[in-house]
Amino acid sequence: MAWIQLRLNSTNEKAEKISEYLEEIGAVSVTFMDSQDTPIFEPLPGETRLWGNTDVIALFDAKTNMQQIVRLLQQKNHLDENTAYKIEQIEDKDWEREWMDNFHPMKFGKRLWICPSWREIPDENAINVMLDPGLAFGTGTHPTTALCLEWLDSLDLTGKTVIDFGCGSGILAIAALKLGAKSAVGIDIDPQAILASYNNAEQNGVAERLQLFLSEEKPTDLQADVVIANILAGPLKELYPIISNLVKPQGDLGLSGILSTQADSVCEAYQGKFTLDPITEREEWCRITGKLNSFV
């Protein structure tokens, strides 16, 4: 499958806002490079580790009207006559090769390993999740994914039900099933995420215990013992009524995709219904966990 790449030059002061806007108007991924083409891997909105002169690189579906994208950028003053930009078609294989070369087995917590299928398993006796997430979905290399995996490893999931809200590659739901959960549900807005999650679940022998739904198609009465959502602070606050209602009485909630500077506002949204644990931080990111109050 081909993608369309838009590459435009920016300053580090503007690059973050441009990145966020590109995602709003349909970019499936955004990366940053300096003038020497040194990448920052797996950025999320809010990253600040940029260079003085930064190239913003966005991938769009091949059917995207790029002239419309350019017009939208111009209307927001993200693109003017002095801004250099380039549009070209990119094949998946160019990106997948770079990703595969840099993806190694990783350990999370005491029991859990995430292993690319093309590499040797470091510990045959551990709980191993074999992962082929494909382009633009999580692999565990970002601090937020790592925080979520470590939290799941710390729980006794034996016989429990789990919901992975914003499942992406399915990495969290699959890890929960391998860690002993009875069943899991993955929810996402992207059909490609649903497909990637199913393929990864099948590869790990847990597909029969994993249900997958697009957000608008999930059952209205859906609930689980453990709910985990690794998305972003804005959606976590906006979707509080939906996410909180997915948790069974006395159930556990895990939230990430949150910058440390955003933790207080997310806690404020959830603390009325949940008894929250101390916040766990890594680099610029954090994880918020808690248990649904019995009086709710």
UniProtKB/Swiss-Prot annotation:
Catalysed transformations (reactions): L-lysyl-[protein] + 3 S-adenosyl-L-methionine = N(6),N(6),N(6)-trimethyl-L-lysyl-[protein] + 3 S-adenosyl-L-homocysteine + 3 H(+)
CDD domains: AdoMet_MTases
Residues that hold S-adenosyl-L-methionine according to the record: 145, 166, 188, 230
Single GO BP term: methylation
Compartment(s): Cytoplasm
Keyword Phosphoprotein on entry: no
HAMAP family: Methyltr_PrmA (MF_00735)
Family: Belongs to the methyltransferase superfamily. PrmA family.
Designated name of the protein: Ribosomal protein L11 methyltransferase
Species of provenance: Histophilus somni (strain 2336)
